[in-house]
Amino acid sequence: MTAPSQVLKIRRPDDWHVHLRDGDMLKTVVPYTSEIYGRAIVMPNLASPITTVDAAIAYRQRILDAVPAGHDFTPLMTCYLTDSLDADELERGFHEGVFTAAKLYPANATTNSSHGVTSVDAIMPVLERMEKLGMPLLVHGEVTHADVDIFDREARFIDTVMEPLRQRLTTLKVVFEHITTKDAAQYVRDGNDYLAATITPQHLMFNRNDMLVGGIRPHLYCLPILKRNIHQQALRELVASGFTRAFLGTDSAPHSRHRKETSCGCAGCFNAPSALGSYAAVFEEMNALAHFEAFCSLNGPQFYGLPVNTGWVELVRDEQHVPENIALADDSLVPFLAGETVRWSVKK
């Protein structure tokens, strides 16, 4: 990577965790991802979750239809794991190059996860098949028991679900997605080569004070929820260390304005427009720009066993204003950092 004071040139990055939704929302948000990233792991939690090969093929085509001319972008599809999922269907999708990975949502952990897994034991035959195939398991790592505090869900998940699972299936490739705690950072750091993590820009930039002090900021509300500053600092230190099993996953998750700014608002930050520049700012603040390219462009392909992208992206130190909103057909989207200025932007 070359890193003059005003320009960062890196291999074209990938986004290893994104929500593109469907319908008009999909058409609005896809270009923000396809313009910058060569590939993206697309989450399967639509209102009707992606649980079959045919559904994934159809969804992939809807995504490709929304990619503007001139964008070179490959959506990597995932299968939504349910208690009743057929392991043969999953294997067929993997062998046919339709499914890149499978996603484990604990039931009711986040948006459109009511169809999720009630217990790991319920899907053990599927997970055993994935281990044999070398197919990555993507995990939303939170328990959802009513008696567990929302700020403790991730740490409890490590002890009660993640570690027992990895002890049982020792060569299953696992991505601990959007980690938010020092517990998870340490767990991944201490893990072996079969365990990796994605980290979002919001969890590197903010903590729960930013969301709650001086008024509630609904556009910082996401799941897993922002944690204390000690957890934010642990994530920042992990990426700044050059740790190679952590990589870019924005978890960009758009919801229309009226679904965010309401008495019972939805979880998710639509960060696709400013995510790459946000990551760059964090790495710069941590004096870790030497590790920026690996986090964005190299570590993910290495874990997934995929080639690195051939193109390049340049970020320039050119302050840009993030728009207050982005138009939808019948509403608007409020992007991450709306109305603020970002100091690194992607050169067009």
UniProtKB/Swiss-Prot annotation:
Binding positions (Zn(2+) 1): 17, 19, 103, 251
Residue numbers carrying N6-carboxylysine:
103
Residues bound to Zn(2+) 2 are 103, 140, 178
A GO molecular function held by the record: dihydroorotase activity
Which residues bind substrate per the record? 19-21, 45, 140, 223, 255, 267
CC terms in the record's Gene Ontology section: cytosol
Q: Which residues form the active site?
A: 251
Pfam families, per the entry? Amidohydro_1
Q: Origin, by domain of life?
A: Bacteria
> How is the cofactor bound, as the UniProt entry phrases it?
Binds 2 Zn(2+) ions per subunit.
For activity, the cofactor(s) needed are:
Zn(2+)
Protein's pathway: Pyrimidine metabolism; UMP biosynthesis via de novo pathway; (S)-dihydroorotate from bicarbonate: step 3/3
What EC designation does it have?
3.5.2.3
Q: How the protein assembles, per its UniProt entry?
A: Homodimer.
Family affiliation: Belongs to the metallo-dependent hydrolases superfamily. DHOase family. Class II DHOase subfamily.
Q: Which HAMAP family match?
A: PyrC_classII
What this protein is called in its record is Dihydroorotase
- Which organism does this sequence originate in? Salmonella newport (strain SL254)
Q: What is the lineage of its organism?
A: Bacteria, Pseudomonadati, Pseudomonadota, Gammaproteobacteria, Enterobacterales
From the UniProt record, report the name of the gene that encodes this protein. Answer: pyrC
